[in-house]
């Protein structure tokens, strides 16, 4: 692949027209946008992070179009991954903020947000993300080719260019999906075995060891790798084996706000135990650490953010209109995009169901354009996984809440407005970053930018239409802020807004988390994964760590660099399928729970805890074996 901008030639030449924006690509793309959006919503609310859908979407597309439909068009496959990956980005932006509205509704402070309201927040955020990113394409994707690496976009292009392997690679994804779906259904559907096993230590009160033996967690651990997994595990260890035993030891007979019972009563009451300490205290400490981690990542990125914004705007001003007649240089009309952005801003202000006033609409436009610009370039430099979207959202929330309070929009009205603004900005930044990676893939393979940009909007509309139902399902089935669905970022955003608006928070606990995060930063460790590990139940971090251990074993296996890469990549495809498979069954089980028929599929017997552990070890062994099969291909 030629990295020299002047000598670069796309795989499909500009003067060649091949099938691209087809009915087949649209239908498969929309389906994958909804599937990966729902799966990532479930995953993100569970473990506080999402995974990229571009490569698995591209591989699945190649498997369907090439193997099943007997067609062969790299640009159709690229269109599918463009549409499909938008679902993951919309889900990421929505789940990090909007569950806060459900939490307030559960507290009786507001009505539950309507499906229409959630749809509009997701839709407007997604379309604004595309509108703000398109003018940057020439500057970031074309002019800086060979300078900005765009890791995920380039990797996806390599997968598409190796399309002759599409069938076998798609089989790996589908195998992971099917195995994880059956495993999840047996565990949490039929209750054949427990999906979480654990043990509380009587002699070390407040502590509890445990692990959730689920395929999605192992998949996340494998994809994130051993380092990130170990940081999360370390955060969980600190919370469940240091902080909680300290609370139990020093506060045994004390009633510590926000709990209304003594620590001893929390530990001994029915339904209590270490989990009661987690829900009453550790969630606040973890939220303080997560918020600080987001702010630290934003502060560390500030020089890059300022430089990025200046360079992007400068490039937009200086670029010429050459080659605009070429198929590979055609973008959506910028004047039209500006009009669309302005119309959306007015609609946000005027639509009665939308909880944002004129000041909020202006904040969305200004911060949206700024963070879309920043996100688009930063993913090119450091990849989507390191894009500080949560930090951008926290900064927006802080500014929006202060401004709304200063202009007289206070109380729950101001808090709902701030979360809605933050939700839109979070989706704007996520979609802008995703669109940048997709357009980079398209640039390499020779796609038509205009058609890709329309495809991105199609993916936004499809996933926005579905995300409200997904959020309602998961809340109705298990409830946000619980061990089942912790919703780490959304809970933290809610606390942040409440703290600024009315100050009714256990600030001592939050500041403990703040200073733990600062200590972690001083030790030169990544704060965010450590902080998320602190917040999550230990059993989740342990399950993720198990996947990280498999990744270590795969990478330690002797072989050439090519063999090692093939093993790792095969594992990435299999675990992407595992995550999607569990996510789909998670949504299905939520539907059954809401319909009150989930109990009808429960088996009359259950394996002991050791059975759960053996089955999980077998799943991990299968993952390792799948990775090693790359040597035989």
Residue map of PLM features:
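Alpha-helical multipass membrane-protein architecture
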Residues: 1-633
């Amino acid at each position: 692949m030629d990295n020299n901008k002047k000598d670069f030639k796309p795989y499909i030449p500009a003067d060649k027209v091949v099938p691209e924006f087809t009915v087949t690509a649209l239908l498969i793309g929309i389906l994958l946008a909804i599937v990966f959006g729902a799966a990532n919503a479930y995953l993100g609310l569970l473990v506080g992070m999402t995974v990229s859908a571009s490569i698995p979407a591209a591989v699945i597309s190649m498997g369907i179009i090439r193997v099943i439909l007997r067609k062969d068009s790299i640009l159709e496959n690229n269109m599918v991954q463009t549409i499909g990956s938008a679902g993951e980005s919309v889900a990421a932006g929505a789940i990090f903020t909007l569950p806060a509205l459900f939490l307030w509704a559960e507290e009786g402070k507001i009505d539950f947000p309507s499906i229409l309201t959630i749809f509009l927040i997701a839709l407007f955020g997604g379309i604004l993300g595309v509108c703000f990113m398109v003018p940057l394409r020439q500057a970031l994707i074309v002019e800086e080719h060979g300078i900005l690496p765009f890791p995920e976009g380039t990797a996806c292009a390599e997968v598409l260019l190796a399309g002759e392997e599409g069938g076998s690679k798609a089989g790996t994804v589908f195998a992971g999906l099917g195995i994880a779906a059956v495993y999840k259904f047996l565990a949490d559907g039929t209750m054949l075995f427990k999906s979480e096993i654990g043990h509380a230590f009587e002699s070390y009160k407040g502590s509890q060891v445990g692990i959730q033996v689920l395929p999605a967690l192992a998949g996340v651990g494998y994809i994130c790798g051993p380092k990130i997994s170990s940081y999360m595990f370390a955060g969980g260890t600190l919370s469940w084996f240091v902080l909680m035993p300290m609370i139990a030891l020093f506060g045994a007979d004390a009633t510590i706000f926000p709990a209304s019972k003594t620590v001893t009563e929390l530990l001994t009451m029915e339904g209590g135990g270490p989990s009661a300490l987690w829900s009453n205290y550790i969630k606040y400490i973890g939220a303080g650490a997560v918020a600080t981690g987001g702010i630290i990542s934003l502060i560390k990125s500030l020089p890059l953010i300022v430089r990025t914004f200046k360079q992007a705007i400068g490039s937009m001003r200086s670029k010429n209109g050459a080659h605009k007649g070429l198929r590979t240089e055609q973008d959506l009309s910028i004047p039209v995009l500006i009009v669309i952005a302005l119309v959306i801003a007015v609609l946000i202000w005027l639509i009665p169901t939308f909880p944002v006033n004129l000041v909020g609409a202006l904040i969305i436009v200004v911060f949206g354009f700024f963070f879309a610009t920043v996100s688009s370039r930063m993913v090119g430099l450091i990849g989507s996984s390191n894009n500080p979207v949560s930090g951008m959202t926290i900064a927006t929330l802080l500014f929006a809440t202060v401004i709304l309070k200063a202009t007289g929009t206070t109380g729950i009205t101001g808090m709902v407005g701030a979360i809605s603004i933050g939700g839109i900005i979070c989706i704007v930044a996520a979609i802008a970053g995703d669109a940048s990676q997709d357009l980079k893939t398209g640039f390499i393979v020779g796609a038509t930018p205009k058609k890709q940009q329309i495809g991105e909007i199609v993916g936004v509309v499809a996933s926005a239409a579905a995300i409200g139902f997904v959020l309602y399902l998961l809340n109705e089935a298990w409830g946000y802020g619980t061990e089942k669905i912790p919703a780490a970022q959304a809970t933290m955003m809610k606390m942040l807004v409440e703290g600024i608006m009315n100050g009714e928070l256990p600030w001592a606990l939050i500041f403990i988390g703040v200073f733990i995060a600062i200590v972690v930063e001083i030790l030169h460790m990544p704060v965010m994964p450590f902080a998320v590990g602190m917040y999550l139940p230990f059993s989740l971090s342990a399950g993720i760590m198990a996947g990280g251990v498999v990744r270590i074993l795969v990478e330690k296996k002797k072989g050439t660099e090519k063999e090692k890469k093939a093993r790792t990549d095969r594992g990435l495809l299999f675990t992407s399928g595992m995550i999607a498979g569990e996510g789909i069954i998670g949504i299905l089980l939520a539907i059954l729970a809401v319909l009150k028929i989930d109990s009808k599929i429960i088996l009359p017997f259950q394996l002991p805890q050791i059975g759960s552990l053996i089955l999980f070890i077998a799943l991990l062994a299968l993952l390792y074996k799948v990775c090693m099969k790359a040597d035989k291909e």
